[in-house]
Amino acid sequence: MASTSPATTNGDVAPANYDLVLKLAPHLDRHMIFPLLEFNAGRLKEDETDKAREILAAKYALLKKTNMTDYVANLYCELEGLKEPPAEYAERRQKVFHQLEKYEQETAKITELLQRDDVVNNLRSDKVANLEFLKKEHDVTIDMVNALYDFGQLQYSCGNYADASELLYRFRVLSTDNDKVSYATWGRLACEILTMNWESAMEELQKVRESIDTRLANNPLAQLQHRTELVHWALFPLFNYDKAREPLLDLFFNAGFINTIQANSPWILRYLTVAVITNRGRAKNAGVHQKQMKDVVRIVKQEAYEYQDPITRFVHALCIDFDFEEAQQQLVLAEEVLRSDFFLLAHADDFVDSARHLIFESYCKIHARISLKDLSARLGLNNDDAEKWIVNLIRDTRLDAKIDYKEGTVVMNHPPSSVYQQVIERTKGGFFRTQVLTAAVAR
């Protein structure tokens, strides 16, 4: 079971109990896991020395197989209390240096060619023809092309992500090896994420998605595994690049990907829920946002026995149980969890504000006159702050409501329709659909 608590109990509320690093890590590249560990280390208190050592050991275990030799040596010294690292680290450093020199020489010719306009202008979309041209005119071999890939991998392992990205790009332009091209695309996506080049990351992410949809169409298990990884990698641009929000929400709600989330990684529901709720007011299409919100509510309900946290419980309490008191309690806990999550910290205030809008909207649907005192409790604000918040809401959204200061109430100028009126409206809709179906059958 993915959650730490299957029910809405408030006894298990420490943010650490909802830390998802151990869930996320198996689906991330080791270089992507490192900033998550750094984030957790930065949140520790001075007296949490045991936890600090655990994270330090985790960093070392994570990176010791990479070629970031100097940094790994420093981690080892810190872990073992040494002033100087063992000689083996100097030997490894020298070995990596020689490998870099070797690949530099092996790729020098093809790199120089790809920087010449007269060569680039003769390249076409046909990779086979390009290789034939380069082989005939410039004595380029397949081994030279593959050396670009190997050099890119080495640079990535050294933590030189920008250089690795460029090498993998050059390789992809020339290679006809579909498997390696696919790996290179994943590699470039990782590089663009780690260098926070979000626009390029989104381009690579789209290429990876297309590869999954086409190359793995006849391998459902491989598709599931690759989609699971892509969803996890996509969290980086999703919460760091505003322009990624809508295309990535479209991706997550795609049938293949939402099924992947539900079947293989239900904890992603936390991030999907936050992304949708904080997208209110930003979404270009209000209808799409409303549908996504309905889908989130449906999935939260379906997955309640697989995954829960204060964020999903807030949605369950407000939109399924209509329990405003429980929703407010879960919102308080949700804010703590958001502030302890690497991806969500920067969105905590936005989520709380958007959640209060949801509470207010839901409350207004069933009340024509609302006590300010009662509403402030629902919103988790004191009376003065609640009053200011509502005034700003009325002003910014042109909500048809006013505050009756004498009575201490918010008066909605569009009271909810009666049950009788709702029945009439639904009957009209049903009658119209019946007419359409009848006409279709008649044709």
Swiss-Prot record:
GO terms for biological process: formation of cytoplasmic translation initiation complex; translational initiation. Its main location: cytoplasm. One of its GO terms (cellular component) is eukaryotic translation initiation factor 3 complex. GO terms for molecular function: translation initiation factor activity. Gene3D superfamilies: 1.25.40.570. It is found in: Cytoplasm. Residues 249-417 form the PCI domain. InterPro entries: eIF3e, eIF3e_N, PCI_dom, WH_DNA-bd_sf. Pfam families: eIF3_N (PF09440), EIF3E_C (PF21357), PCI (PF01399). Keywords: Cytoplasm, Initiation factor, Protein biosynthesis. It comes from the Eukaryota. HAMAP family: eIF3e (MF_03004). Component of the eukaryotic translation initiation factor 3 (eIF-3) complex, which is involved in protein synthesis of a specialized repertoire of mRNAs and, together with other initiation factors, stimulates binding of mRNA and methionyl-tRNAi to the 40S ribosome. The eIF-3 complex specifically targets and initiates translation of a subset of mRNAs involved in cell proliferation. Component of the eukaryotic translation initiation factor 3 (eIF-3) complex. Belongs to the eIF-3 subunit E family. This is Eukaryotic translation initiation factor 3 subunit E. It comes from Neurospora crassa (strain ATCC 24698 / 74-OR23-1A / CBS 708.71 / DSM 1257 / FGSC 987). The lineage of its organism: Eukaryota, Fungi, Dikarya, Ascomycota, Pezizomycotina. The gene is int-6.
